[in-house]
Every structure is written in C-alpha cells, then in structure tokens.
Amino acid sequence: MNVCRFLLAAVFIFSGFVKAVDPLGSFYKIQDYLTAFGMAAWSPTYLQLLFAIVLSALEFSVGVFLFFGIRRRFATTLALLLMIVMTPLTLYLALANPVSDCGCFGDAWVLTNWETFGKNVVLFIAAVSVFKGGKQIIRFITAKMAWMVSMYTFFFVFVLSFYCLDNLPILDFRPYKIGKNIKEGMEIPEGAKPSVFESKFILEKDGKKQEFTLDNYPDSTWTFVETRTVLKEKGYEPPIHDFSIVSLETGEDLTDSILSDKGYTFLLVAHRIENADDSNIDLINEIYDYSVEHGYGFYALTSSPEEQIELWRDKTGAEYPFCQMDDITLKTIIRSNPGLMLIKDGVILNKWSDNSLPDEYVLTDSLDTVSYTHLRAHETVLDL
C-alpha cells in the first residue's frame, strides 16, 4: 500500500507543480478541451483560468498530504475522485483524439493520449488501494506540524501560480526558452523526412471569406481575417516546426531574414491583440523608439485580424510593423499577452511579460554595453 501511496504522491506533486509554474499553459489546455467538446462559450475565461489554478493547487496539495501522511481522509478521497474522473476521460481522448495530448504534465512531459490512459489506469488502481487502506497510512509529522504543512502547501502553490501568471513561468519547458536557437530548433536531422506545413490565410472581400496561401496571396483590396498553419504531410517533427512570420502589409515571409539578422530584434508577441493588456503601452512605444534609434529590429506578432490591429494602432498610437503568426505558436513562445522577446541571430536572449518590461532607466545605451539577459523594469543592470 505504501508503494501506491508514494507513487500517487510523486505523480500529484509533479503534476500540480508543473501546472502551477505555467498557469496560462494549463488555461490554454482547458480551452482546448472546451473547444473540442463544443463547450467554450459555456463559461467565462476568468473561470477557466481560476479552474486551472485551483486544479494545480489540489493536485499538489493531495500529493504533499499523501507523502507526509496528513489529512488522510481528504487526500485519499480526492485522489480517488480525480482518478474516477480522469481515467474514463483519457480513454475517450485516446479513442476519439479530440486533443493532441491531455496536458496532465504540462509541457514538462508530453504523453500521447494512449500513454496517458495507461498511466491513469495504474494510478486509478493505486488510488483505490490507498483509499481502502487510508487508516493504515503512517503520519510522518506531528498533528501541529500537519496543520503548518497544510497551510504552507496551499500558500506556496497559490503564490507560485499567481507569481508566474503576473510574470513568466519560473521554469520554461517549451522550445522557446531563453538561450535556445530558434533556427537550430527548426532543423531536420540529415536523412529524416520532414513534415510539410503550409500557412493558410483567410481574407475577406465584399462580405465573402476565402482561403489563400503564400503562392496566391491577394492584393490589398482584401481584408485579412486570420492565419493558421496546416500539416500537409507528417514526417520528423523538430521541436520548433511552425515558426513562420508573415508581413501584414506585403504578405512576405520574413522568417529567414529576422532569424538570420546579426543585430538585435525585439518581437512583441500578442496572440490576440484585441485581448492584450494595454496598461504598459507607453513603455512598449518607448522600447520601439529605442529600437529605431539604435537600428534594432522591432516587429509585433499576432494572429488577430487586420481590423483589430487597426483598432490597437488607433488606441495606442503604435507605429511598429505588424506580422502574422499562428495563434498556438504565439501562445507557446511567451506566456503573456503581450510579451516581449529579444533575439539575435535566431538566439533567444531574453523574454519579458508586460509587467516586467525593461524601461528608460535601463535602455539608455546600446545593448552591446548592457547585460540584456538580466534586464528588468526598475532594476539596475546586472553582470552576466
């Protein structure tokens, strides 16, 4: 029984923790579920985000309680209830495949739907065993310490979630973490057959929507609606496989030129510009002016339609160029809307949420003279 107990504890602690450090990632996965089941409009987005945070807190707490042998009735009952819900759900996911993966371990460990179902069968058996033998669980700490551990556990996981939500995840398991080379992440090993992707563009004219590709992109009389990346032929899939930057004005693919630029380039990432936080827009405009002054590139990346981009420009006075990119890719790049990423020759040097942007006290000289990888708003520049 103790083997089952510690197995459940380890899995729940790990699962809860990786969700807590990336609450927006969990939120996006919940949105995927609701969209797949046709339930996206049933609840407001703030409730979906709250559910993501509460779920991570419950999983982490259950794991800690099982490990220390405290709150035994609560922990064993909740563990069993979670597995009663998740096991048949993941069986359905394995059979119907409405989402690519369950997201049970976030981006830290991606399992196929069948692997997830097999894992949940084992955990369900363990949960039943622990529930039946709950009274035999040995407590490792005193009753007084149990109360303190319980309170600290809840406090820790909620503070962690809200900190990572307000800033960026303290651990980045995605292929776009600081220090990664985007170009290398897109490379196909010699001899491997690459997957074939195609960018699809939906544009509208005279009330009629039509789909285009880069080969037949229409003239400026058409209004852009959205873009998406479509898998045409499955092959070897590199860690980064859908990074494509297309100019809004010309329809030109700028991916290679931006990733090959030997200078610094700021990328303002806003997966849906109409939902982006505009509280720090003056600072964003200052960073753009700084980029122009020093000859650095600056592009805004979004998947929003052209009319929403124009509304953003009118509201914020934005003068920087806009480019189109796949919505899922933008969400993967940075967990902030908007967020800012600094790259050079395809290497990610730093990322900032809109709450931690570098300001005029830091961005005074050339980036060659400052420790850009440690820039933070209202902080002195730290040495590398």
What does each model-identified segment do?
Residues 1-21, 46-89, 130-131:
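Functionalized membrane-embedded alpha-helices
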Residues 13, 298, 315-337:
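Short, internal strand/loop/helix patches
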Residues 84-137:
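Membrane-embedded alpha-helical segments of integral membrane proteins
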Residues 141-168:
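Internal/C-terminal transmembrane anchor helices
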Residues 160-253, 257:
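Membrane-interface segments at or immediately adjacent to transmembrane helices
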Residues 338-351:
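A short, hydrophobic beta-strand/beta-hairpin element that forms part of a small beta-sheet core
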Residues 373-380:
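Conserved small/polar residues in nucleotide/adenosyl-binding loops
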